[in-house]
């Protein structure tokens, strides 16, 4: 999935 700039993931 496409991850946003700032989330729980790095």
Curated annotation (Swiss-Prot):
The gene is rplP. It comes from the Bacteria. The lineage of its organism: Bacteria, Bacillati, Mycoplasmatota, Mollicutes, Acholeplasmatales. Belongs to the universal ribosomal protein uL16 family. One of its GO terms (cellular component) is ribosome. Part of the 50S ribosomal subunit. GO terms for molecular function: rRNA binding; tRNA binding. Binds 23S rRNA and is also seen to make contacts with the A and possibly P site tRNAs. It comes from Acholeplasma laidlawii. Keywords: Ribonucleoprotein, Ribosomal protein, RNA-binding, rRNA-binding, tRNA-binding. This is Large ribosomal subunit protein uL16.
